[in-house]
A protein has these predicted regions:
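Solvent-exposed segments in extracellular or luminal domains encompassing
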Residues: 26-30
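Short conserved beta-strand and strand-loop elements enriched in small hydrophobics
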Residues: 32-40
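Terminal peptide-recognition signature
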Residues: 11-13, 36, 80
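Short, Lys/Arg- and Gly-enriched loop/turn segments at beta-strand edges
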Residues: 19-25, 44-48
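Conserved Radical SAM active-site core
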Residues: 42-48, 52-198, 208-217
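Conserved PDZ fold ligand-binding element
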Residues: 1-20
Length: 217
């Protein structure tokens, strides 16, 4: 226990790599031989060498699971189920997450609209796979209209980069009658199939509508 990190300290540096969040931690601690650089409360740094089974967790616990805040959604989708929630529910149900880390770790779906170039490259470099993508349409203009985000059309190009890097993707399409069904859906299915085998699955689900839609699309 005395050799471990001090409670409340920063994440350890692993094999020369700084750890920014849980993805870095899981990726860099997978190896059986690790050199951890720990920072003491007085600011001194020391190195601890660890031997373990490949993939075995070190058992460190962090203040939050992601080691920072979950990234929130930057879209205003015309079919958003969170916007149709009844009032008076617990606060966490109204949080719209759109975080690549939660996609990989928890199976959440993301739209790719708030990923920076650096984050795209990080997903490829760390082999973060599979990820679940809310696609809805591969038509860039229509996707911008549906997600109400001017960056939404860039998502398909990002998916093609992931496909070229062999990042596995599970895709979801929320089918909205008269908007992204019919010929638009045919195009989406055709273009997603063209990214196989990286596109592992495609699910088409009907849009859900509740009575709490005042002021919505």
């Amino acid at each position: 226990p005395a050799a471990g990190p001090a409670p409340g300290g920063p994440p350890p540096e692993v094999n020369g790599h700084p750890v920014a969040d849980v993805l870095d931690y899981k990726f860099y601690t997978y190896d059986p031989k690790l050199a951890l650089v720990l920072q003491e409360p007085n600011g001194n740094r020391r190195t601890v060498r660890v031997r373990k089974e490949e993939g075995e967790d070190l058992g460190l616990e962090f203040e939050t699971y992601l080691m920072d805040r979950a990234r929130s959604c930057a879209n205003n989708c015309i079919f958003c189920f969170v916007d149709q929630m009844p009032p008076g529910m617990r606060k966490s149900l109204y949080f719209k997450d759109d975080d690549a880390r939660l996609s990989f770790l928890m199976g959440n779906y993301l739209t790719l609209t708030n990923l920076s170039q650096r984050e795209v490259e990080r997903i490829i470099a760390l082999r973060i796979s599979p990820i679940n993508v809310s696609v809805h349409t591969t038509d860039p203009e229509l996707r911008c209209e549906m997600l109400k985000n001017r960056r939404a059309g860039e998502g398909i190009a990002i998916m093609r980069r992931f496909a070229q890097a062999s990042i596995t993707m599970n895709c979801q399409i929320v089918s909205c009658p008269g908007i992204n069904d019919g010929p638009a859906l045919d195009r989406t299915l055709r273009e997603l199939a063209g990214m196989a085998p990286a596109v592992n699955s495609i699910s088409v689900v009907p849009v859900g509508v509740t009575k709490y839609r005042e002021g919505l699309y």
